[in-house]
């Protein structure tokens, strides 16, 4: 059987992708030159894998490229782009998973995979298969961000998002449980655990961290007053990890921080890569997970 715990060389993995406390003292503080050297090495490794994948290699050959043409990260602009429409065509061409994964039935039988999907805003949600290293790295990236923001062993993080085909709640759970020593309180959405009960659980178990969407955080703060006759600030929350994309003028963050009495940190990610960018305690912009992603 393809046992998950045997699917990764864990000592190798930790050398490649440092755990949160080590990351905060190494990659997170490295100078740009050292980051660039590491990224170039990893980029070439990924490109070599891409040449073994029909979806990528066909596109690259159509663009007139050969394997020897890509020699460093400086050559990334020579690689043709693809978009969600190309992924949809891949799914239609080779259902149900598409050929962009480079996965066949023998891989599926020998390796544990996790399926997550997009939100489906432009059509049927697109599925992405994550093999163990990709799945772990998504969770680890979230854990690193939380550690930099102040999460520590013994904290309790409430996750009022349902573990479904969306990856955010799964990764928050794994980040806490597998990499931080933080207790994940997986209450799910209000459909699973009513808002009043969410708050009752929070007070009972000492929730001091949250991962949630801003709109529901406002709902929780209001319900705490109207249904429990309490102030949500009584929870003494250390910080909240949220997703503030629509908050262009900062008004929503300001309201949330006032009502909760704690910092609200923005997060950027996708269902394909997990946490790509995060805010630190200074809240002056995004840090990138630079040993995992590259921003052009």
Q: What is each PLM-predicted segment?
A:
Residues 1-117, 124-137, 148, 204, ...:
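Nucleotide 5′-phosphate-binding alpha/beta core
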Residues 74, 138-156, 193-206:
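Conserved ATP-dependent adenylate/AMP-binding module captured primarily in the ANL superfamily
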Residues 112, 135, 162-166, 215:
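Short glycine-enriched loops at secondary-structure junctions
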Residues 116, 174, 254:
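Active-site phosphate/pyrophosphate- and oxyanion-stabilizing loops and adjacent acidic/basic residues
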Residues 123-137, 175, 182-186, 206-215:
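Acidic/glycine-enriched edge-of-secondary-structure segments
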């Amino acid at each position: 059987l393809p046992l998950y715990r045997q699917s990764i060389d864990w000592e190798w993995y930790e050398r490649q992708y440092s755990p949160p406390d080590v990351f905060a003292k190494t990659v997170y503080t490295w100078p740009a030159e050292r980051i660039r050297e590491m990224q170039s090495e990893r980029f070439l490794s990924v490109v070599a894998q891409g040449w073994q994948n029909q979806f990528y290699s066909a596109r690259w050959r159509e663009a007139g490229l050969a394997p020897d043409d890509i020699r460093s990260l400086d050559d990334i602009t020579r690689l043709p782009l693809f978009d969600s429409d190309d992924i949809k065509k891949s799914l239609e061409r080779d259902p149900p998973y598409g050929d962009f994964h480079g996965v066949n039935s023998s891989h599926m039988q020998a390796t544990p995979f996790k399926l997550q999907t997009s939100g489906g805003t432009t059509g049927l949600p697109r599925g992405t298969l994550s093999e163990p290293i990709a799945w772990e790295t998504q969770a680890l990236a979230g854990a690193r961000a939380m550690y930099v923001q102040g999460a520590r062993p013994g904290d309790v993080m409430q996750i009022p998002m349902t573990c479904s085909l969306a990856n955010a709640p799964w990764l928050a759970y794994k980040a806490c449980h597998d990499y931080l020593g933080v207790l994940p309180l997986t209450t799910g959405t209000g459909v699973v655990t009513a808002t009043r009960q969410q708050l009752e659980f929070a007070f009972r178990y000492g929730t001091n961290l949250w991962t949630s969407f801003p709109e529901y955080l406002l709902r929780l703060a209001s319900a705490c007053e109207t249904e429990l006759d309490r102030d949500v600030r009584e929870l003494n929350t250390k910080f909240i990890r949220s997703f503030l994309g629509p908050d262009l003028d900062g008004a929503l963050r300001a309201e949330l921080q006032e009502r909760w009495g704690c910092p609200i940190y923005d997060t950027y990610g996708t269902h394909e890569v997990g946490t790509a960018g995060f805010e630190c305690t200074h809240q002056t912009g995004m840090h990138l997970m630079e040993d995992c992603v590259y921003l052009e």
